[in-house]
Swiss-Prot record:
It comes from Influenza A virus (strain A/Gull/Maryland/704/1977 H13N6). GO terms for molecular function: monoatomic ion channel activity; proton transmembrane transporter activity. The lineage of its organism: Viruses, Riboviria, Orthornavirae, Negarnaviricota, Polyploviricotina. Cytoplasmic tail plays an important role in virion assembly and morphogenesis. GO terms for cellular component: host cell plasma membrane; membrane; virion membrane. It is found in: Virion membrane; Host apical cell membrane. The modification Phosphoserine is found at residues 64, 82. Residues 64-84 are annotated as: Disordered. This is Matrix protein 2. Forms a proton-selective ion channel that is necessary for the efficient release of the viral genome during virus entry. After attaching to the cell surface, the virion enters the cell by endocytosis. Acidification of the endosome triggers M2 ion channel activity. When the channel is activated, one or more imidazole moieties of His-37 probably become bi-protonated. The M2 protein from most influenza A strains is inhibited by amantadine and rimantadine, resulting in viral uncoating incapacity. Emergence of amantadine-resistant variants is usually rapid. GO terms for biological process: protein complex oligomerization; symbiont genome entry into host cell via pore formation in plasma membrane; symbiont-mediated suppression of host autophagy. Residues 1-22 are virion surface. Belongs to the influenza viruses matrix protein M2 family.
Amino acid sequence: MSLLTEVETPIRNEWECRCSDSSDPLVIAASIIGILHLILWILDRLLFKFIYRRFKYGLKRGPSMEGVPESMREEYRQEQQSAVDVDDSHFVNIELE
């Protein structure tokens, strides 16, 4: 006798969905939550660069320039640029023992 004859094979009827009571409110709620979760996950993966960049950099804007004379605006921009230039030329050397 072969081992293949002793293995139980599922009948096609067992593979079919037995969701005859799909009008159950819990099943409907779970389906809606699952679909919404899938949609939000897809949107997150498609737009994550824009969303997280907005949170990371959008909230760190400089002070408002309303009512500030143009000469002071230019002075502020130059200070900010010089601070960036100093940071770009600064390197940290780490020596491992």
